[in-house]
Amino acid sequence: MDSALVLFAFLFHCLNVATAAPVNPELQEMKSNVIDIAKELSLRLESIIQTSIGPKFSPPSDELNGLSSIMAVLDECTNQISDNFDEAKKIKVDISSLMDSMSEWSDKHCGEQPSTQAENQTSRRFSITESMQAVTRLKHFLLLLQNNSDQLEIC
């Protein structure tokens, strides 16, 4: 009886594996690139947060609702980080790399994406404080993205 049950479980597993949908190599490459960059950027942001002097911020709870919402949050965080903030250039380059990977995929496989509006940084009064809030938000958002990378498949 036990061997029949084991055989049934094995055959059921083989059937599931054999009937699985084929994996899109472009999608897997984009997801892999995004996750790798997100991990590297998360570590850099964690270092910035740990060494910062000043108030600690709790991030807003962003939700992942597909590729366009992910790109919108990343764009918003980029706009909130002041160019005067330490390591802003490195952070923005990494975010740009993330967005380029997602944008390339989106251009090929999704419809037209809504445009995002850049905010003018010259009118900011508390740019360093706002930058720290954006860094904290971005770090938590990247962790959420790494844990929910399937959202990258949704246009």
From Swiss-Prot:
It is found in: Secreted. The keyword Signal applies. GO terms for cellular component: extracellular region. InterPro entries: 4_helix_cytokine-like_core. Expressed at moderate levels in the liver. Expressed at low levels in skin, gill, muscle, intestine and eye tissue. May function as part of a signaling pathway that acts to regulate the size of the body fat depot. This is Leptin-A.
